[in-house]
């Protein structure tokens, strides 16, 4: 077996199961799970209908790694509309690659991007990432022979990795920089100046920027959608998106996490090599999935409604949780998480489950210990993915639990 498998840490939800083992919540209280970021809004009917229609004529042939040309075209035009790029700025034939959701793509991308042989030349490659982070950034880095390097995201730095705190020697060893905007779990959005700084560092030191933008369509202010890496690159004069790759998904945007559909877009030179890797990796997106994805990228009305529902939940839940935990909690710029402070994230999570049958996630499970500490310690992640009524009820139970004496 690959000895690097021993480097992988237990996944957050495995740790959560261990933490909650043996806890017996009140049987009279229905379980409200707010731990996993799995959208539970009803999927748009037109996506389901397109999927059913596609099944009638798509199961008799293998999908190709490149993806359907009409889907690549739809994605390219969506990127241009959404991020204010000129028409044909994104070439559908070599700048867009459909994938089976961002999780699969983030993993395989690192395998293609990391030059593990550089370790034999005396310099183990680095993959830099925010901390806390989506765990799929760390695992593939370890399996590719790279060393993960964690950049703490705290309230003091606006929950954005401090790029200027990284020394030149570290940047010279960096092969991939992961960004996540809006951030998971903080919801922080990277402004144009921040992305331009990342682009400057990438040009100087030669690393690839992998920007996870799967929450880009979940934002609070309809008048201010988050900027993306390709938009920042184009406006900075990098019109071919050199050393840039963005990852988008329908899971959050369209509430279809079970469809497993997304895309990678950016640097054509790199995507050509990445496509070669995927040809052998054997992970082409099924044709029926692609055909169901096509209308999803062409429609915005259902996404606007999605945002309305999340906005309503934030407005209703945030003040209740803030009052219960006796702290100021700002509604995040994007995403669907709250990231409040608690005295002990593990004890709070277990107690809340045992007494109120509500599941949240300890913040420490989403982060790693660094010289300056674990930025998830003393935080919990609350995923506002349930219905509005369930989120209201969960907030009420959190408030009741917070008022109860601890034993």
Predicted regions and their residues:
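N-terminal small-domain helix-loop-helix segment of the aminotransferase-like
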Residues: 2-104, 108, 144, 296-297, ...
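Generic structural signal for small/hydrophobic residues in well-ordered secondary structure
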Residues: 16, 34, 51, 75, ...
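Conserved core of the PLP fold type I
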Residues: 59-200, 217-218, 222-238
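PLP-dependent enzyme catalytic core of the Aspartate aminotransferase-like
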Residues: 77-81, 85, 239-240, 354-359, ...
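Conserved core segment of the aminotransferase class I/II
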Residues: 78, 231-311, 318-320, 401-402
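A short helix->loop->beta-strand "cap" motif at the edges of active sites that frequently abuts
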Residues: 125, 204-208, 241-242
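Helix C-cap/helix->beta junction micro-motif
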Residues: 144, 204-205, 356, 405
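Conserved glycine-rich beta-strand-loop-beta hairpin in the small C-terminal domain of fold type I
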Residues: 290, 294, 309-318, 328-342, ...
């Amino acid at each position: 077996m690959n000895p690097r498998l021993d480097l992988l840490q237990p996944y957050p939800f495995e740790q959560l199961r261990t933490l909650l083992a043996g806890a017996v919540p009140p049987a009279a209280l229905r379980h409200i799970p707010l731990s996993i970021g799995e959208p539970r809004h009803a999927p748009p009917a037109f996506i389901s209908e397109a999927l059913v229609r596609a099944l009638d004529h798509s199961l008799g042939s293998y999908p190709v790694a490149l993806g359907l040309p009409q889907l690549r075209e739809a994605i390219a035009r969506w990127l241009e509309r959404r991020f204010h790029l000129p028409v044909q700025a994104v070439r559908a034939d070599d700048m867009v690659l459909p994938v089976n959701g961002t999780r699969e793509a983030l993993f395989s991308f690192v395998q293609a991007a990391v030059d593990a042989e550089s370790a034999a030349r005396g310099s183990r490659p680095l993959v830099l990432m925010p901390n806390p982070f989506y765990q799929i950034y760390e695992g593939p880095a370890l399996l590719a022979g790279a060393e993960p390097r964690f950049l703490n995201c705290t309230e003091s730095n606006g929950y954005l990795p401090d790029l200027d705190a990284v020394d030149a020697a570290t940047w010279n060893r960096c092969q991939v920089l992961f960004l996540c905007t809006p951030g998971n779990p903080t919801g922080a959005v990277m402004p144009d100046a921040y992305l331009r700084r990342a682009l400057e560092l990438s040009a100087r030191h030669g690393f690839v920027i992998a920007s996870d933008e799967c929450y880009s369509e979940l934002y609070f202010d309809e008048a201010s959608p988050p900027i993306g890496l390709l938009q920042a690159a184009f406006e900075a004069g990098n019109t071919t998106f050199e050393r840039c790759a963005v990852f988008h998904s329908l899971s959050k945007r369209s509430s279809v996490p079970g469809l497993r559909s997304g895309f990678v877009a950016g640097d054509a030179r790199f995507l050509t090599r990445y496509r070669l890797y995927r040809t052998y990796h054997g992970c082409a997106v099924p044709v029926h999935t692609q055909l169901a994805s096509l209308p999803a990228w062409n429609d915005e009305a259902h996404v606007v409604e999605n945002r309305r529902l999340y906005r309503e939940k934030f407005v209703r839940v945030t003040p209740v949780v803030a009052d219960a935990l006796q702290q100021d909690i700002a509604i995040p710029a994007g995403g669907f998480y709250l990231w409040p402070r608690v005295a002990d994230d593990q004890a709070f999570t277990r107690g809340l489950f045992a007494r109120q049958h509500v599941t949240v996630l300890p913040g420490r499970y989403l982060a790693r210990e660094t010289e300056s500490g674990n930025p998830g310690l003393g935080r919990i992640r609350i995923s506002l993915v349930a219905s509005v009524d369930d989120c209201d009820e969960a907030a009420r139970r959190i408030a009741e639990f917070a008022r109860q004496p601890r034993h």
